[in-house]
From Swiss-Prot:
Interacts with RAB5A, RAB22A and MUSK. InterPro entries: SH2_dom_sf (IPR036860), VPS9 (IPR003123), Vps9-like (IPR045046), VPS9_dom_sf (IPR037191). Residues 381-518 form the VPS9 domain. Guanine nucleotide exchange factor (GEF) for RAB5A and RAB22A that activates RAB5A and RAB22A by exchanging bound GDP for free GTP. Plays a role in endocytosis via its role in activating Rab family members. GO terms for molecular function: GTPase activator activity; guanyl-nucleotide exchange factor activity. This is Ras and Rab interactor-like protein.
Length: 563
């Protein structure tokens, strides 16, 4: 069996084409995505003046990086001429330089399709996903206990706990070597045991970019490969020592856990009960909208005002109803009063919208979910049958499933896919989808000494997992559900980044050619056009550059005749 590879040559993206991380809730509210933890971001934020040395010359930066482990990096220069310098290989010439570009939506590497709010967010992502880099970034060293003696001259920064265990202090060794130690003596360099010092816990590699989704392609500099590292909580300093209270760090990490299950969040229970009561009160606006959607789901006719794909129209109607109800309820005084009585948790105005969304999914969408999925299965019946037939054909060509060494990881992935389908709220589905991506990357890692792989390996790996999935039809509907129901702000960044990857993997399976034994060598022109159209229609770029195509319905490539 031969699976298609994504195009490795990609255009330098325009500002409109970039997948931008949502900024509405601030940096501390960014979704965790495939990182599964806030540790990399927290470490980078607290050690920013360790790895960011604007006054350092490129020649000196290269000399330092040559002494450090693979994946070590520095950000040098002043805006707008900042560059990322990365040690990509063992030889002295393997120091790569990447221009950091700044846009109204954040920062991005040159030739990359992904934009993040700031440098720490971008580097945190690049510590797990190489994107256009040849390897992932190796983050600064983790916290060490009181009394630990580290004399390694290759250490990027030193973070220590005082004898009371209550304060962290950071000393930037790079700064001391460059500017002198203010009365401190630089220890004599000894031969480091880099293999032992930097035997860091392996991290799940993630892909570079889904370049085959983007607009017309142009050549790009070929940067590949990576290594991964997940750090602990740190602090930041340039030469002086900066102190942080350890308990505050722990609270921040706990509060940034974005992967909590819906059932674990009990603070919205009163709000859910209130909205459920409104849905049962026949005269209320919520009840009228609920009845309209229920009638739409059991009706045999489509939307007379939008003569496009029926399944896409249905999901657009669901999204429109949920958006209208969320806006209506967020302004309702009774809802705001219930929200204000949630308990001892800290209330913030920006938390009201997400709380109403979760409550709406529980009180309105969840009761209608069986009817919604029955309707979607009916509308997609022909396409789902073809997808299942192609899946069976690919299984035959792949051989017995038991031959796979990653069977345990595969069972975990299939269990997550089942939970993904059982979930109702779009945000919960996205969290589970990204968790599946992490599991796929874990299977790609293979071992501590194995070089992590990028998107060229991730797409076939994801496709293979879907070939053996017992839930592939439900997964197809879940992906389409998320592509239509997620807010535009949530579709920027990792959510849109990976949804298009899943779209591509499912497309490869659905269009597998049993006669030739090959998957399609890339997406068809129809699929590419659909994705570009979807991207313009469903992201906030539509507001920045409205086009005639932006208002057209998203025509899936399902209508292609079954060969």
């Amino acid at each position: 069996m031969r699976l298609a590879q994504p195009d490795m040559v990609s255009a330098a993206p325009t500002e409109v084409d970039r997948l931008v991380w949502p900024l509405a809730d601030g940096a501390d509210k960014s979704p965790l995505g495939v990182l599964s933890t806030t540790e990399p971001l927290l470490r980078l934020q607290r050690t920013q003046r360790v790895w960011e040395v604007p006054e350092l010359d490129a020649q000196y930066a290269k000399a330092f990086l040559e002494l450090w482990p693979l994946g070590s990096f520095l950000v040098i220069g002043h805006e707008p001429g900042q560059v990322l310098m990365l040690k990509a290989g063992p030889s002295s010439g393997d120091i790569n330089t990447y221009q950091i570009q700044r846009f109204p939506g954040g920062v991005s590497l040159e030739s990359s399709n992904l934009c993040m709010p700031d440098c720490p967010h971008l580097l945190a992502f690049l510590s797990a996903s190489r994107d256009v880099l040849p390897r992932t970034l190796l983050l600064p060293t983790p916290t060490v206990g009181a009394g630990d003696n580290h004399s390694d001259p290759h250490r990027l920064g030193c973070i220590q706990v005082d004898t009371s265990g209550r304060v962290l202090s950071v000393v930037n060794q790079l700064y001391l070597e460059t500017h002198g130690g203010w009365g401190t003596e630089t220890p004599q360099q000894t031969e480091p045991e880099t293999g032992q010092k930097y035997s860091l816990a392996p991290r799940k590699p993630t892909p570079h970019r889904v370049s085959w989704v983007e607009d017309p392609l142009r050549p790009e500099a070929h940067h590949t490969g990576q290594e991964v590292h997940h750090p602990g909580a740190d602090a930041h300093s340039l030469g002086s020592e900066v102190h942080f209270s350890c308990p505050a760090l722990e609270e921040e990490e706990v509060n940034n856990d974005c992967y909590k299950d819906e059932d674990e969040e009990g603070c919205e229970d009163m709000l859910t009960a209130h909205i459920r009561a409104l849905a049962r009160t026949r005269s209320s606006y919520v009840a009228r909208q609920y009845r309209c959607l229920r009638a739409r789901l059991i009706s045999d006719s489509g939307n007379p005002y939008s003569p496009g794909d029926p399944a896409t129209e249905l999901l657009q109607d669901v999204r429109q109803l949920l958006t209208d109800l969320q806006n209506y309820l967020a302004k309702d005084p009774d809802v705001r009063a219930v929200f204000g009585n949630r308990g001892p948790s800290i209330l913030r105005e920006e938390d009201l919208g997400p709380a109403v969304e979760v409550a709406l999914c529980r009180a309105v969408l969840e009761p209608l979910k069986p009817a919604l999925w029955t309707k979607l299965r009916t509308l997609r019946a022909q396409e789902l049958r073809r997808l299942r037939r192609r899946q069976i054909a690919l299984r035959v060509g792949a051989g017995p499933e038991g031959q796979s060494p990653a069977l345990r990881n595969r069972n975990r992935i299939h269990a997550r896919l089942a939970h993904l389908h059982a979930a109702c709220a779009p945000r919960r589905k996205v969290a589970l989808l990204l968790a599946v991506c992490s599991d796929v990357y874990a299977g790609l890692g293979g071992g501590e000494n194995k070089e992590p792989l990028g998107a060229d390996a991730f797409l076939p790996a994801l496709t293979e997992e879907l070939i053996w999935s017992p839930h592939i039809g439900e997964t197809q509907l879940d992906v389409e559900f998320l592509m239509e129901l997620l807010d535009p702000g949530e579709l920027r960044g990792e959510a849109g980044y990976y949804l298009t990857t899943w779209f591509g993997a499912l497309y490869h399976i659905a269009h597998y050619q049993p006669d030739t034994g090959r998957a399609p060598q890339g997406l068809s022109s129809e699929a590419r056009a659909s994705l570009r159209q979807w991207h313009r229609r469903r992201t906030l770029h539509q507001q920045a550059q409205p086009t005639a195509q932006a208002n057209q319905p998203f025509e899936e490539p399902w209508a292609i005749g079954d060969p």
